[in-house]
Amino acid sequence: MNSNKSRGSSVERYIVSRLRDKGFAVIRAPASGSKRKDHVPDIIALKSGVIILIEVKSRKNGQKIYIEKEQAEGIREFAKRSGGELFLGVKLPKMLRFIKFDMLRQTEGGNYAIDLETVEKGMELEDLVRYVESKISRTLDSFL
């Protein structure tokens, strides 16, 4: 496994572990480098009926992050079919941020990109957890 895939897998396992610790049901579904033809996000997490999908990218520096058109459209379709909300998880040195996938812009070539400035404005893991928890519907009975 090359260092980029190894680093990405390590970040994915870290996110899965942290979300599990926060009460999520989580699976890691890495497809990078596999013979899978369908595109699925790296992480699928559920909590009380709320579904989040996370595509993870890891970089050593602040370069732009690109996602190929076919992959981006495939995981967007997966999100649509599942009813989940799609995020890009970006790991940079000393920073892990989550950005709504809709924040990516499409390039002239049809691929998708996000710059460091937008990544820096993303949510930290705790913010993502609070975001999901704010979407959990609670009935009056749950307070009794």
Curated annotation (Swiss-Prot):
CC cofactor: Mg(2+)
Residues annotated as catalytic: 32
Disulfide bonds: none
InterPro entries: Hjc, Hjc_arc, Restrct_endonuc-II-like, tRNA_endonuc-like_dom_sf
Keyword Metal-binding: yes
GO molecular function: crossover junction DNA endonuclease activity; DNA binding; magnesium ion binding
Binding, Mg(2+): 12, 42, 55
GO biological process: one example: DNA recombination
Residue(s) at site: Transition state stabilizer: 57
Activation and inhibition: Cleavage stimulated by PCNA123 and PCNA323 and by RadC2.
Subunit record text: Homodimer; forms a 2:1 complex with Hel308 (Hjm). May form a complex with Holliday junction DNA, Hjc and Hjm.
Name of the molecule in the record: Crossover junction endodeoxyribonuclease Hjc
Gene name per UniProt: hjc
